[in-house]
Amino acid sequence: MLNRMAMVSGLENDPVMKREKEWSVQGLYTYTTPLFKEAGLSDYRLLRLLQEDRENNTDLYYTLKVYLLNENNVTMAADSLHIHRNTLVYRLKQIRECIEADINDNETARELLAFMMMYDISRQDEKRQK
């Protein structure tokens, strides 16, 4: 059993394994999103953030998504967004104030990212249906 665990842990950085994991997650969200949508489930924090983006022409939703996808690493997220680290820190402060949540709390971060993925997939589905 330890040999199998060592083999799997050794493949974490393998591009094929990463792609398989991404497809699995994408598939999970693709099939569960309609159920959440049908039940009327959404996250008020993200709705508030999207409203802030619409009203003030900000990009806080995308900023938060990139930050969470980079495992709350400010340096990596700033690089991904092609912005200065201090700019990201300022945006994260705005996000915290807007959604009134600790985005560095693991459970909160997972919830937000899960709802973001479902929201993004539902938007893609809506675009395809048009």
Where are these regions (language model features)?
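Cytosolic nucleotide-utilizing catalytic cores of signal-transduction proteins
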Residues: 1-130
